[in-house]
UniProtKB/Swiss-Prot annotation:
It comes from the Eukaryota. Keywords: Calcium, Metal-binding, Methylation, Motor protein, Muscle protein, Myosin, Repeat. Coiled coil: none annotated. It comes from Gallus gallus. This is Myosin regulatory light chain 2B, cardiac muscle isoform. One of its GO terms (cellular component) is mitochondrion. The N-terminus is blocked. N,N,N-trimethylalanine, found in other myosin light chains would not have been detected in the N-terminal tryptic peptide in PubMed:7319048 because it would remain trimethylated and ninhydrin negative after hydrolysis. The keyword Chaperone does not apply. GO terms for molecular function: calcium ion binding. PROSITE patterns: EF_HAND_1, EF_HAND_2. Residues 23-58, 93-128, 129-164 form the EF-hand domain. InterPro entries: EF-hand-dom_pair, EF_Hand_1_Ca_BS, EF_hand_dom, Myosin_RLC. This chain binds calcium.
């Protein structure tokens, strides 16, 4: 029997599996499996409706489900699912870039900024945040008892999707 040839890594990132680490792919696979309620290998409107119901959100509008499914170029199998996440994440700035933006407001390098100050900056500068966006940010990343926002953790979560252990 002839020796097996090693698979070449696809250059230029066109292979969606090369965009993620193996552990990330496994996590996406687990999420896909949970969402594929009828276990047919595809996520469709019925699967999405069942997933929302399992999360306690009932009465999801059919139009909303259709819009979600339409985001895919075709039937949503695991590869399409992974590709969709890859495309969404591709535009995310690297963690260091986001950290550097926050460091402008933290010349002493403490790793935190007064929440009131960052709120003022985000609501008054170019690309203004709405009050609702500020509320969402502080709901997800509440300031500490001293009123400081831990921007290092915020940056980590923005770029990695989960808090550091």
């Amino acid at each position: 029997m002839a020796p097996k040839k090693a698979k070449k890594k696809v250059e230029g990132g066109s292979n969606v599996f090369s965009m993620f680490e193996q552990t990330q792919i496994q996590e996406f696979k687990e999420a896909f499996t949970i969402m594929d309620q009828n276990r047919d290998g595809f996520i469709d409107k019925a699967d999405l409706r069942d997933t929302f119901a399992a999360l306690g959100r009932l009465n999801v509008k059919n139009e909303e489900l259709e819009d979600m499914v339409k985001e895919a170029p075709g039937p949503i199998n695991f590869t399409v699912f992974l590709t969709m996440f890859g495309e969404k994440l591709k535009g995310t700035d690297p963690e260091e870039t986001i950290l550097n933006a926050f460091k402008i407001f933290d010349p002493e390098g403490k790793g935190h900024i007064k929440a009131d100050y960052i709120k003022e900056m985000l609501m008054t500068q170019e690309g203004r945040f709405s009050q609702e966006e500020i509320n969402q940010m502080f709901a997800a990343f509440p300031p500490d008892v001293s009123g400081n926002l831990d921007y290092k953790n915020l940056c980590y979560v923005i770029t990695h999707g989960e808090e550091k252990d």
